[in-house]
């Protein structure tokens, strides 16, 4: 057998949402910072993302990451998040998956009862505490980058729906956060297709008509995700959500960065205090816990430091190959 590429990856899921973590078999990703590494990967090695995320090795809703050498000397490893549509600066469920995999495969030595992990993403340094029992990562709590409400009460005309009102908040990426009632739908699995269609239309309109720019991170200048929320069905949950991203992908988890953005939004509106309990429910009924640890500033924006808690499970170890004679070697999407 002769292959042009042999790639190793760890598969896991966090509250139902997949994370395929590439740990070997790809070229050196150049860059003096994680944003530079992300840019290099996108401009020079994007065929690896499409090969691993899309069919026949993946699927439309696949999510993944590439584990790299960090740029910050204090970090245990670097991470670049990706999906079927491109790359993300930060991902909460992916962070929980990566930290779990790092502990359970020995990338970071396990220390019981709690192992401290420092991960570097394009959005910044992420610090996590992993609860470890008998060498197994049971739960991950991580401090996300500062989150803040960027624009409140934005209104646009959404074709087929009418005028809708929403907030734009940052939780590692920019989110449009909209109540399900604005779209006339409930957050239920059978509505996933329609919710996705409307969310993608909304995201396109926002990025076409509204100027978006992170105040300190020049490379973050678009709304990448749409977070639709509603009243919960789980007795322990505060709210229920579904997050749509990429090329119309549906997050199965409550979305860690989306939870962070929601915490910041509620705090800015006086609806959630520092240290107050918050539980977010996914479209599947799985849960993340969220908490505001402290208040801070991002340039002129009032911001919060969110802590997100959840669990991930390794589901497999993959050894992918790329055959140059395969006409579909770099993946395809059919939807």
Curated annotation (Swiss-Prot):
It is an enzyme of class 5 (isomerase). Keywords: Isomerase. It catalyses: L-proline = D-proline. One of its GO terms (molecular function) is 4-hydroxyproline epimerase activity. Inhibited by pyrrole-2-carboxylic acid (PYC). The keyword Isomerase applies. Its EC number is 5.1.1.4. The active site is at 91 (proton acceptor), 255 (proton donor). Pfam families: Pro_racemase. Belongs to the proline racemase family. This enzyme does not require pyridoxal phosphate (PLP) as a cofactor. Homodimer. Catalyzes the reversible interconversion of L- and D-proline. Plays an important role in the regulation of intra- and extracellular amino acid pools, allowing the bacterium to profit from host precursors and enzymatic pathways. Strong B-cell mitogen. This is Proline racemase. It comes from Clostridioides difficile (Peptoclostridium difficile).
